[in-house]
Structures are given as structure tokens and as C-alpha cells.
């Protein structure tokens, strides 16, 4: 009884302290906005029944601290039920409690036992284990109290919700603040997505006393005491305020949504306007650009064309697009493609549509360079240009060696001349330029060019061999060029020499010696023994004096390309003979269809010079591309003029090529089919100089007959490159290099692509090897040679095998796989091949005369007794190549 009295006293002292705290008036801060659904404050909790307000979270308008109150119960650390005053102990049914709680007038200690329940610090209900926290309905407890099998920590969880310091409801995340309905919390409690600060207030109010007892409670992280206060009058009208706030909120949301829609429409409208302006700007810029282009490249007032022109070329001349011309032609009813040609009449109509005119001209007139008006008073004597011609091995090059005191043959493979050479010597104070031409039949064009650029031809004829085919050819070249001939009969030092025989042979070609009453100069020489050389030079100077050779060194240079090659260190190097005028470094020129500007001039001695005059041979560096040997060389006023002339000549070349295109007609259809049946040996030809390329190409293309032919798919001067190997691999061709070798990379690529490269230094070897390859491509001749015959004495029909003829070899031999003719009554009734030959049951290769055997003929069963089987052996005879 005394213990109960002490407990009551302690409880009373606690109540007195709480009453003192209540006397301190505090300001309560309330939130301006209310939750439309829960009707609860976010910063304060209102206890409707007991008029208590706390910072903790309230359910059903209950005041709370760390403990949660249910059903209008005041809470501290302990939880109160049914208006019960609580401390550390909990009271039930309006019972006063201390550390121990009494139920149903039962005495309690530290542990309270209910209905034979074990107690400790925690109070157990209905056979439940307790700790500091009170468990209900077989629930595990900690500091927090769990309901309905919920795990608890400091926070109290409802309906299987995870808790922290804050209490979560309806799967809401909590921190120090308590969240409701997916609301974010801070130190204050948020309701219905309303923003929270530490305190949000719309109205200040004083809090009065309350009869209910409370303990100290603190709001998390704020460390403020919870004070009971009277509920202000504003709470009574919460429902109406909530309704108005909801309407106001909906109205604001509607206005905001409407503003967003209008803003989005405005953005789309502005974007469309911007895009439209951008498109218009682009179109305008394109029109301006086209206008500027037209101003920069206006349509010419007149254009020059030949008989026909392609649409692309016409568009280029008119500074228009090909598509524009094609569209215009379509409007005129003419359907063409970009590379299709139109005649001059159609071109005239089309050009007139654009306000221009057409001048139909001959392109030949445009390819000529207008020469200077020559002042005859400036013409002076020039050195003679002498071309040495004759048959191979008649001593032409040896003669030049004597004239220059050098051994030229050491520089030529095989001891024969395969390049045209130019040398200048001085004799009796006068210069003489010599051109050495090859004597081999393959170098006909070189000899022809030599005759065209020369002043005098020295025809070298062997006193032993006499007149040979190339001798006659040289005579014809000289006569065509209208060039005088001096005959040098060489090798007179040999015992078998017969100069008179040579004179007699040459007289048949209108070359009659002066001592025979003719006008042709004959000189007997021996280049080996240096006999008659001075006399020959004297005759050359005499002949040139009689011809009155003159030139004007002050005019622009005119000459001819003798040869061209590619030097690895210098590029394209061309040997040019200057016929008139003087060539300087820096001059612009045209050589054939090529143009260029002189970068360097190198003499025959290998010395760089600044200029070269008439009748001199010089090596020129500066060609834009490789010219052809024999092309005319001419200096122009400007580089622009040189480019224009070069372009015109290229057009002429294309025009002539287009005219030479062979069209298939009914008349030549058979020839085309026959030509397609020919076997071709495709060759890619590379040589050191352009003249050698030309000579070797002409010689190889002559190797043609009814079955095979050579086709040079590509030829040029220079080393064998990777491009040549790739071309050969694609076209299934072999590569022939004449005096050139492949680069290291080209050789590696050739090994990878299995491309055959053949290298030659002598033209004879190249032609001979190609002939051998062509012979291998020829189909061999097939001949049937009689080897024997056999008489059929029995016919045996073997099931699943066939008909076997039992034979007796009456003459010669019978071989397996031999060709047979089956003869009956003197007539051939079948021709076939022996598929099986046996002696008794053994397979044999052949059966000799007077032996019996079994013969089965392939795919033939109509054999009878008395038939004669003739056997033949097929032999293939290799053909020899004949042109």
C-alpha cells in the first residue's frame, strides 16, 4: 500500500512540472494550405478532443511526439489509449501507472504481468514477449511499437511499411519528416504535396492549458518542446477553407495548363515561321549564287564547234549544266544523253535558244600556231643536220664513234643501235649535227623521222653485203623527204669488199655515182681503219654549202621531237631537234598534243645550257605529259596560248578516234565473229624511250595470223610500276619491259598476282620469244596414222557389259584407245573408239599381228561377223607460227 502511495506522489510531481510548462505561452505556426483529402496541418498537429498541438505526426487529429497516439490520446514516450494518462508506464482503463502498470486492480513491479503473463521492462499482452516497446498481437517490438506483424525501429510502421525516425504511411518514404501520400518531408511534415520549411505559418495563436497530462517530447532535429495549446478558431472552418483552396488550386492549375498549351502553340508557330524563312533564305541564296555564277561565267555570244559535238562538251563551251541542255533538247523533241553527239544543225538551234550563235569551224585550222612574220635579213647560215642511215651491222654507229672519238656501241645492248641519237661535232671550225638511226626493221618510224628533220642523208652500205632491205627503205625515206643522199661505202678494208657491185646495185635506185655520170656523191670509207673519214666530212660541208642552209636565230623556236623518255630523277625528258629559231629556258611550248614550259636544257655532252640555236639537238625538261616521237615542237607567246592549242589538238585526236570506230553491219558481221574467235596474247609494253615503245609495238602487232594475234593493251615509256601490274592482272596480260625493270613494289605485287614479267635488252629476243608463245597457242594439226586392222570372227553379247567382237588381227597391231572405222562390204558404217581390248580375260594395251583378241567399241553394238575393224592412231603435230 505504501508503494502505491509513493507512486502516486511521483506521478503528481510530474504533473505539476507539466502544468508549469503549459503556462508558457508559445506561438503556434500553421500552414496556409490544407490537404484536401486528409484535412491535416503540415507543420502542427491538432488534437480536436483535447486541443493539443505538437510537431510530431498525428493520425485522426491526434497529438504525437516520438510516441504515436491513437483515438485522441495524449502521447509522450508512452502511448496512451482511451484518454489514459501515460508516463513511462502505460495505463489501461483510467488506471494510474508508474514503472509498473496495473491492470484490473493488479499490482505491478518493473514488469507487469497480465493474465499469467511474464513481465519485464516491457509489458506483455496475451502471452506476448516484451522489451522496451510494447507488442501487440504476437508482434516483435523494439523502441517502436509495431502493429499487424510490422517490423519496427525508431519509427512506427503501419501495414508492412519500412520506417526510420519518421513514420511512414501507405508505402511512403520517411526521413526526419513524416510523409503522407507520397509527399516529400523535411523537418516539418508535409501533406498533399505542399512545400515545407522548418515552419510555415499563416496565423499566430496562443496555446492554453489542458487537463490532460503530457511528458516532454521533441520534434526530430529541431529540439523544440511540445506544448499543449488551445485550438484556434480557424480550425473549425477547415472544411470550407479546404474546399475553396482546392477550387483555387484547380483554377490555377487550369490556367497554368492553358498557358503551357498556348506557349507550345506559339513555339510551334514560331518554329514553322523560322523554318519557312530558312527555306526561303536558302532558295534565295541559291538563286543569288546561280546569278553570281552566271555573271562570272556568262554564256558566250558565239561558240565554235566542229561537225558534231557531245552534249557535255557543248555545255562546257556555253558555261551551262549538261542537265539544262538535256531538258531544253527534250522540250525541242530531241532525246539525248550527256555523252551523245548532236549534229551542227541541232547544236545551232539549241544555242540560239540562249541567244548565242554557232560557228562551224574545222578543228584542223585551230591546231596550228600562227608563225611570226619573218625578217629575211636576219637569216644566217646554220650548221647542217646529217642523218646516218643504212642496214643493220653496216657500220653506221661505228662511223659516229670515229667522228666523236668514242665507242658508242658500248652503250647499246647487243652492239646494235636501238635508239635515235643526236651528236654535234666541230670540223674545220664548223659545226655538224649527226643523227644516228637504228637499222633494224622494227625502227622504220625512227628512220622516217630522221629523214624528215635532216638536211642531208648519209647512206652507209657495206662493201661486202651490198644493198639490203633496210638500205632500200632508207633510200625511199630520203626520197619522200626530198633530201639529198651521200653514199658511204664502208668496210673497203676487207678482202671480200666489192665497191663496184654496190654502185651497180644502187644505180638501180637512181643513185648513180658522179664518176658514172650521175649526181650522187659516193665516198669509200673504212670506219674501223679510219679511212676516208675526212673526205666524207668535206663532202658533207660542200653539199650543205650548195644547199645554202640558213635559219633565223632571233625567232621563236621550231623543231621536232626525236624521242621521249621518263627519267626517275628528272621526269619526262624529250630529245628535240631545233630546226629554226632559238629555244630559251622559261619558254612556253606545244609538243604534239602536250604543252609545257622549259625548265632545263641539257646538251648531248650532258651540260646544262640556257639556250640552244638552230640545227642543234637538245634534251628538254618541262613537258606536261609524254609526247610521241616525231611530234612537232613549237614555242608560243604565252603559256595560256600553249594550253589552248594543246586542248584543241586533244579534241582533234578524240574526233579522229571517234571517226575510226568500227560499226557492226551485216557486211562486216562475219568478220567480227571471226575476229572474236581469234586467240589473243595480251601484252603490256614498257620501254625506256617512246621511240622504242613505238618500234616494238609495231613489230609485235604484226605477229598475227588466222588463229592467234598479239594485242598490246597498253604501252608507254618508263619503268614498270604497280599500276602496270594491276592492269596486267585485270586484263590477263604479260608485261614486257624493254631496257626497263620493275620497281621493288611492282615486283612484289607481280609475285602476289602471278603476273609474268619478261625483260629484254635486244629487240630480236623480244620478238622471238613472243613468236614462241604464239606457237604454243596454236592448235596442233591432227593426223590419223593407220596401225592395223582385224577381222570379226565372232560376236559375243555379254549382259550388262555390251557387245564384244571376237577378232583376229590380220595386219599391223591393234591398240587400246585407238580410233576405228568399222567396214562392211567395203563401206564405212561406223567410226568410234576402242573402249576395251582383251586377250582372253586379261586387259591389254595392244595386240600384235596374227593374234586373237576381244574388241569392244564405245557406244556401238551393231557389229556382225565378217566386219573389218580398221585401227588408227591420232598424232598431234605442232604448228609453226607463220604470219
Curated annotation (Swiss-Prot):
UniProt KW keywords:
Cytoplasm, GTP-binding, Initiation factor, Nucleotide-binding, Protein biosynthesis
Q: Where is this region: G2?
A: 415-419
Under the heading Pfam families, the entry gives: EF-G_D2, GTP_EFTU, IF-2, IF2_N
Q: Which residues form the tr-type G domain?
A: 381-554
Q: Which residues bind GTP?
A: 390-397, 436-440, 490-493
- From the UniProt entry, list the residue stretches annotated as the region G3: 436-439
Region G1, annotated ranges:
390-397
Q: Indicate, by first and last residue, each region the UniProt record lists as having compositional bias (Basic and acidic residues).
A: 46-62, 251-260
> Which residue stretches belong to region G4?
490-493
GO MF terms held by the record: GTP binding; GTPase activity; translation initiation factor activity
Cite the residue spans of the region called Disordered. Answer: 32-216, 251-275
Q: What is its main location?
A: cytoplasm
Compartments where located: Cytoplasm
Stretches of Polar residues bias are at: 32-45, 75-216
One GO cellular-component annotation of the UniProt record comes to: cytosol
- InterPro entries recorded for this chain? EF-G-like_DII, IF2_II, IF2_N, P-loop_NTPase, Small_GTP-bd, T_Tr_GTP-bd_dom, TF_IF2_bacterial-like, TIF_IF2
Q: Give the start-end ranges of region G5.
A: 526-528
Q: Specify the domain of life of the species encoding this protein.
A: Bacteria
Which PANTHER family does the record associate with it?
TR-TYPE G DOMAIN-CONTAINING PROTEIN, TRANSLATION INITIATION FACTOR IF-2-RELATED
Family, according to the entry, reads as follows: Belongs to the TRAFAC class translation factor GTPase superfamily. Classic translation factor GTPase family. IF-2 subfamily.
The UniProt function text for this chain reads:
One of the essential components for the initiation of protein synthesis. Protects formylmethionyl-tRNA from spontaneous hydrolysis and promotes its binding to the 30S ribosomal subunits. Also involved in the hydrolysis of GTP during the formation of the 70S ribosomal complex.
Protein's recorded name: Translation initiation factor IF-2
